[in-house]
Amino acid sequence: MAAPEVLESDLPNAVALLKNLQEQVMAVTAQVQTLTKKVQAKAYPTEKGLSLLEVKDQLLLMYLMDLSHLILDKASGGSLQGHPAVLRLVEIRTVLEKLRPLDQKLKYQIDKLVKTAVTGSLSENDPLRFKPHPSNMMSKLSSEDEEEDEAEEGQSGASGKKSGKGTAKKYVPPRLVPVHYDETEAEREKKRLERAKRRALSSSVIRELKEQYSDAPEEIRDARHPHVTRQSQEDQHRINYEESMMVRLSVSKREKGRRKRANVMSSQLHSLTHFSDISALTGGTPHLDEDQNPTKKRKKIPKKGRKKKGFRRRR
């Protein structure tokens, strides 16, 4: 397609964009003029503002000025190579990107201050209402005891030392500070699905499918689990000790149970019919298997009315 045809096809879109831009510029200009008049009339006190917001306003204003200058030169047919406005735009954009972490940290405080300035009071669910008040740490009983001690000291006049009951102690802030929990149910569900997807991607089913359809050479390893190696070392140490000291060591019930569990973990027969949950990858709802959520055995509690069986004494 020739260049004149391209210009003719883009001309209606360019005219529509210019009209829209002109309308937006007029609306923004009217709003800025209204705010300027109110600020000059001291309707909005700006003496105690945030310097970060002021810096952002100045940077955005400079960015718009350089961008307008760049658009003007481009519309006039000038070259943008080595243009000083391009370097300034890159610098301002970099500074604005670096300010994003500060915006995220101050977002909650700024929103709270704006809401307080509009409504004139804090909301009932504001987390700052739950902060510790040092005045509430003073007990009324201690203040009454202090007054009684001072009255007794005034009457007796024996010594000018105060009693240790009413002495003011240094306030120690609590270690657990109340934090505002703003996580929604949708975000919690999203995190749960992400964990299920990671678990499904690392399952043995997906790993075997990758090995089956992969063109890479198959790698065969002969390794032992860490708990099996540790158990073998302990058994060998026990055997060496028994042979050297000529003593048979007793094995507790806990040790027997631990060995039994280790043997079950090392065997591969229990996992022949076990398949991991990959419903998170297929669009289904992930569920907990019996291995992930085992049922706890109930402890047998003896009844109070029963008596222990004992040996009968022979006569």
Curated annotation (Swiss-Prot):
Q: Which family does it belong to?
A: Belongs to the SAS10 family.
What does the UniProt keyword field contain? Acetylation, Cell projection, Centromere, Chromosome, Coiled coil, Cytoplasm, Nucleus, Phosphoprotein, Repressor, Translation regulation
Q: Where is this region: Necessary for interaction with EIF4E?
A: 41-174
N-acetylalanine: modified positions: 2
Q: Where is the composition biased (Polar residues)?
A: 264-276
> What sections of the protein cross the membrane?
none
Q: Where is the composition biased (Basic residues)?
A: 295-315
The protein's location, in the record's own words, is: Nucleus; Nucleus, Nucleolus; Chromosome, Centromere; Cytoplasm
User: Which organism is the protein's source?
Assistant: Bos taurus (Bovine)
GO CC list? axon; chromosome, centromeric region; dendrite; filopodium; mitochondrion; nucleolus; nucleoplasm; small-subunit processome
Q: Which PANTHER family match?
A: NEUROGUIDIN, SOMETHING ABOUT SILENCING PROTEIN 10-RELATED
Function of the molecule: Part of the small subunit (SSU) processome, first precursor of the small eukaryotic ribosomal subunit. During the assembly of the SSU processome in the nucleolus, many ribosome biogenesis factors, an RNA chaperone and ribosomal proteins associate with the nascent pre-rRNA and work in concert to generate RNA folding, modifications, rearrangements and cleavage as well as targeted degradation of pre-ribosomal RNA by the RNA exosome. Its dissociation from the complex determines the transition from state pre-A1 to state pre-A1*.
Q: How does it assemble?
A: Part of the small subunit (SSU) processome, composed of more than 70 proteins and the RNA chaperone small nucleolar RNA (snoRNA) U3. Interacts with CPEB1 and EIF4E.
Phosphoserine is found on 121, 142-143, 204, 214
Bias type Acidic residues, positions: 144-153
Q: Where is this region: Disordered?
A: 123-174, 252-315
The UniProt entry's coiled-coil ranges are 5-42, 181-205
Protein's GO biological process:
maturation of SSU-rRNA from tricistronic rRNA transcript (SSU-rRNA, 5.8S rRNA, LSU-rRNA); regulation of translation; ribosomal small subunit biogenesis
Q: State one Pfam family annotation.
A: Sas10_Utp3
Q: Which InterPro entries match?
A: Sas10/Utp3/C1D
Q: This protein is called what?
A: Neuroguidin
